[in-house]
Amino acid sequence: MTYNQMPKAQGLYRPEFEHDACGIGLYAHLKGKQTHDIVKQGLKMLCQLDHRGGQGSDPDTGDGAGLLVQIPDAFFRKECKNINLPEKERYGVGMVFFSQKEDERKKIEKQINALIEQEGQVVLGWRTVPVNVGKIGTVAQKSCPFVRQVFIGASSDLKDNLSFERKLYVIRKQAENWGVTEGLDFYFASLSSQTIVYKGLLTPEQVDAFYSDLQDEAFVSAFALVHSRFSTNTFPTWERAHPNRYLVHNGEINTLRGNINWMRAREQQFVSESFGEDLNKILPILNADGSDSSILDNAFEFFVMAGRKPAHTAMMLIPEPWTENTHMSKEKRAFYEYHSSLMEPWDGPTAISFTDGKQIGAILDRNGLRPARYYVTKDDYIIFSSEVGVIEVEQENVLYKNRLEPGKMLLIDLEEGRIISDEEVKTQIATEYPYQKWLEEELVQVNPDPESREEEQFSDLLTRQKAFGYTYEDIQKYLIPVIKEGKDPLGSMGNDAPLAVLSDRAQSLFNYFKQLFAQVTNPPIDAIREQLVTSTMTWLGAEGDLLHPSERNVRRIKLYTPVLSNEQFYALKTIVHPDLKSQKIDVLFSEDLERGLKDMFTQAEKAISQGVSLLILSDKKMNERLTPIPPLLAVSALHQHLIRKGLRTKVSIIVESGEAREVHHFAALIGYGADAINPYLAYATYKQEIDEGRLDISYEEAVSKYGKSITEGVVKVMSKMGISTVQSYRGAQIFEAVGISRDVIDRYFSGTASQLGGIDLQTIAEEAQRRHREAYQDDYSKTLEPGSDFQWRNGGEHHAFNPKTIHTLQWACRRNDYNLFKQYTKAADEERIGFLRNLFAFDGNRKPLKLEEVESAESIVKRFKTGAMSFGSLSKEAHEALAIAMNRLGGKSNSGEGGEDPKRFVPDENGDDRRSAIKQIASGRFGVKSHYLVNADELQIKMAQGAKPGEGGQLPGNKVYPWVADVRGSTPGVGLISPPPHHDIYSIEDLAQLIHDLKNANRDARISVKLVSKAGVGTIAAGVAKATADVIVISGYDGGTGASPKTSIKHTGLPWELGLAEAHQTLMLNGLRDRVVLETDGKLMTGRDVVMAALLGAEEFGFATAPLVVLGCVMMRACHLDTCPVGVATQNPELRKKFMGDPDHIVNYMLFIAEEVREYMAALGFKTFDEMIGRTDVLHASERAKEHWKASQLDLSTLLYQPEGVRTFQSPQNHKIDQSLDITTILPAVQEAIESGKEADISIEINNTNRVAGTITGSEISKRYGEEGLPEDTIKLHFTGSAGQSFGAFVPKGMTLYLDGDSNDYVGKGLSGGKIIVKSSEGFNSASDDNVIIGNVAFYGATSGEAYINGRAGERFAVRNSGVNVVVEGIGDHGCEYMTGGSVVVLGDVGKNFAAGMSGGIAYVLTEDVKAFKRKCNLEMILFESLEDEKEIQQIKAMLERHTAYTNSQKAEDLLDQWEDSVKKFVKVIPKNYKQMLASIEEQKAAGLSDEEAIMFAFEANTKPKQNTAASGQKQAVVQ
């Protein structure tokens, strides 16, 4: 049995889609003292992180756990009596996993011995590692490797440790390469003279039980680096357990494909003094089949072996953000700039700890997206981990408590016996070479001269526009809004046009590629509010020598954006510099596209051989005979070709393109390798619009605004995948193809997913030539086509919702006419191939049933849901109509992310129920309170939305009416954007935590997780099932939206058919399908659609666009403008009067769908719905599919693949609620108090494994007493210790939680009226404002209550706070981000980017240096004031007095003692719009209006200034 049992690709499953996350930890003695206790404590730490790891279908088989320690020299001398070991550090130990086959093992050992001797080293002997197979899980046992250790003696010529380590590395790399050639499985967990790794497919508590070595008292080390893994799959893979050879990694490398490609390109240019002739023996440097963590480890190890210090290597691979950081020293800035000219960052959420055995370091990614806390003790120990409380320590012995900050490093030097600070280590490394001098002297400046610009005068402009697919819609609905609005324009209602491969029309190649996005396993990042971590810097020219620092390396051109104006482009192509020659290649073809590509390759290679370093690919010389090669194909093909030839780093690829005009085009070109792009035809189009008077702006301003908008759009596209820098995005191929053949992908887009195959090179050529021919033949038409991508037009692109389908559906449901409904479904199903499901036909040979034998419509309809559409996006009338209808049917409506009015939780007098059965929890957490959560049958975590995955929801300010703001806890008239990520979900184990939180908040509700279809969503779904979700929703890219960038609507995500089938198949392969209910949504329109979804694996079904159409929507696609003419998607009281919908219409629609489903079931012979699920054997490709000129090339077999196993939900998840502290301890002690309202006061010990303390108790209060809760301080809970994550989440009024000690992330998440007090433990006597006492993302989405924190907090404190009043003694970066209410008093330092996106509430920050504080703030939305209002001063003083009373804060006490002076040191931070609204409201109230009327008048005044809204004594009624 082999130790690696990752299944081969089958159906839609691909092994390369696997992701992982984890908990990491380090326990070390700073002076290097080696003890067995360190090993024991490391193992204990591992067990305390068990909840951050994962288990699959076999609960006794972990996803992987292990530890990395120093070589235990005394232990090996005791155990290896028959091996003559040289002195310490003069021998290396290899930890090797072999197959259990003895003959295979002996063959491998023989080869390893030969390689050791060949390299001049000494084979000292082998040892079989004793293991206890009976102590591990069944699945782990079946795949358990045979573990052996090889001992290698150093030759006398290797004088130092690094030379010996390098030789061991060369031996291992050769052995690995030989193994690949021979097709033999073995794996070196480690091979070093300094460190050794013990790991496996184990749970944390199994590690020392399995490896008895670890129990021996002689097994000593000065440190233990530990890791507990959570994989998205359940397949046994021993080698993917951590630690790796140099590092443990918690996070994900989002740019991996690009990092691999660029390393591959560079390694053929490497020359190394350290390796000499051994360099070729170690290639390839990266094992591309490994996990992202192991590939990062490969890169880290190589640079260390090549002579870089570990800390230097970490700074190169994971640089802190420097381009926007004005606080950074010029030396450090120069270091980062120099290295950025040589290589791109390895970007993504990352906490790594690394070691070479002498130094141990840790570094956090630039965004601070992983937790990393540490204690330093008075007796010289450091405890570093993802969580505090993992090792017990006397508080009197703790010297200080801290956290690793974004981009910062912690370094422990065991030989020097001290911690080296981030500032010291980076300054030391940054000043080793004169980087600043080199940059000043060698960087090549390009200064565009406006006078020298080649003026673009195209006599054939219209022809060119037509040839490149320009339409009137492109210009009027995209190019002009881009510069007027300064961003990618918004659209709404989603995409209902066909995929490019299904379209009857010739399509741009760009349209076959879909942008990838982050969900669950890594977060999207916030490119708008957290812009300081992004960079658009671009380097041109040949790359320098990465291994040898030199001034020559920076002889390159630095650009601040990859979008080139004509002036910049002209300056580049005419530059005179010996190292920067340019050459233009015409990328055109006449008949043979393949020939055209080969000619381009030949010309490029020749140019590079002649010293050219700037290659310009131009289509400008197109004519009637010569067609442009699609620029995306030209760029990617050349990029891949040059990588294969080892030439890519010698040249930059610059594109002069007539086709590139949208954000998606630029993103795709950069993503596939373009260094810079000049969109000459877009500029010429602007010039035409200006010259002809249709655009009132100067040409220079238009070009500037366009370049800025496109650049920001590209950053937003990158950020959806969690990538911060254009440099990392370039060549990273963060796309998937839909409808491109495997041959084209392998040759020209290698590494890109294309799950269904598709069109070949000939068809790509035909599409380009068809457009080209039409452009040159179309002499009689002097105008562009109108265009119909976003809006239906007669004769244009097909749209599923068109006048015929809309009208027929509405009348059928209004009249309750099933025959008319059948006319609608005939039109929807049969007119065109609009969706992938239209490519299938049913097996006509099935034995039919009588209709009455089939499950009833009343039963089937209970599987139906309406989609997540928020109150705010929809009118009150539309939102409630959906809820009433679905509750009548026994189905479910979904609140969406805008909260819900509590009045709806009580049934109406007529028996109707307006309560949404599904309550959504999205990243904005609007209205998410304990009372909201307990009033649900299902709680849905929205990880992504089909129309805009990787982005937050948007509600424009003109739709945030007072009643909407009230439900959302925000400011009327101020636009709301949800953060792109859930700030408590940066990885799979974070999602598991939120699922656990919500299950605690409502034990009776199912927990649902909404994902968007993409390649790899199946593996993510498996991880979500392991994270104990009850329902998984796979949403299609074509889902509706109230407001989304057009780029996202068209170009992100996949059809649900692909994602659903992949999720179903992957869950079955993992043995997890029976644990979850699978649901799908995204333009489900008919009963046939439901049947197709069921056959592909769905059990439940969401409808959103169709029900809105039923209620009256006419697809005006103006939802975001608040101008909906039928009262569906507006808050405007006058327009809402036009609402004609009725819950009965929705009831009719749903029953019609169910009835049509029954007809199909009868025809196919299925008696019950469950029988039909996953039965893809009744489908085959339709005749229509076989006849279509493009769709006929698709391979649909992967969609229909059926693995063996259970196809439906069978067994509920085990949420382990019965093991929670609330159930075992708290609730029994306070149950009587909850029931009687009497006071209760209890004391409880707590540790980091006790998560979500207080939440279940709070939910019981909310169920009984509603939003009012209990009187203040009714239930007092006194905790002592280190609390686990989500301490006090969602606790309502009446509960007070005291914590003596410290806490992990998410304290007070969703606080709903309760009170939280955290103070330092008895005995810990360090200054509170110098010590970190709670973790990241505290009080996220909190709605009311109060809190007092006697110490510092981590990153993103009070994100989306909408009502809590809190005092804290210092916070990290991004504090008060997206805050909409409440007040935050900070008695200490704040981190960078304070108050970004803050639209409500007030912060009061104590500072000695106001200027320095202001430099840390995001100034976009806020004002600074001093504290002058006496009432306000008294409020702050009262908060400090309570803080002192609750926490004994010395800091607060000192401030109160000197209050007259102290108050002058506070800076008040208030959002501009919030202040304006408050002032307007007071003004209206002074004029005699009631509170309600004043708020409405203020809203009108601030959002609709043209209307006369002055209060003139006349009172207006407010419609609610």
UniProtKB/Swiss-Prot annotation:
GO BP terms: ammonia assimilation cycle; glutamate biosynthetic process; L-glutamate biosynthetic process
GO molecular function per UniProt: 3 iron, 4 sulfur cluster binding; glutamate synthase (NADPH) activity; glutamate synthase activity; metal ion binding
Cofactor(s) the protein needs: [3Fe-4S] cluster; FAD; FMN
PROSITE patterns: GATASE_TYPE_2
Ranges annotated as biased composition (Basic and acidic residues): 900-913
SUPFAM superfamilies: Alpha subunit of glutamate synthase, C-terminal domain (SSF69336), FMN-linked oxidoreductases (SSF51395), N-terminal nucleophile aminohydrolases (Ntn hydrolases) (SSF56235)
CDD domains listed in its UniProt record: gltB_C, GltS, GltS_FMN
This protein's pathway: Amino-acid biosynthesis; L-glutamate biosynthesis via GLT pathway; L-glutamate from 2-oxoglutarate and L-glutamine (NADP(+) route): step 1/1; Energy metabolism; nitrogen metabolism
Induction: The gltAB operon is positively regulated by GltC and negatively regulated by TnrA under nitrogen-limited conditions.
Gene3D superfamilies per the UniProt record, alphabetical: Aldolase class I, Glutamate synthase, alpha subunit, C-terminal domain, Glutamine Phosphoribosylpyrophosphate, subunit 1, domain 1
Quaternary assembly: Aggregate of 4 catalytic active heterodimers, consisting of a large and a small subunit.
NCBIfam families tied to this protein: PRK11750.1 (NF008730)
Membership in a protein family: Belongs to the glutamate synthase family.
Protein's UniProt name: Glutamate synthase [NADPH] large chain
Species assigned in the record: Bacillus subtilis (strain 168)
Gene name for this UniProt entry: gltA
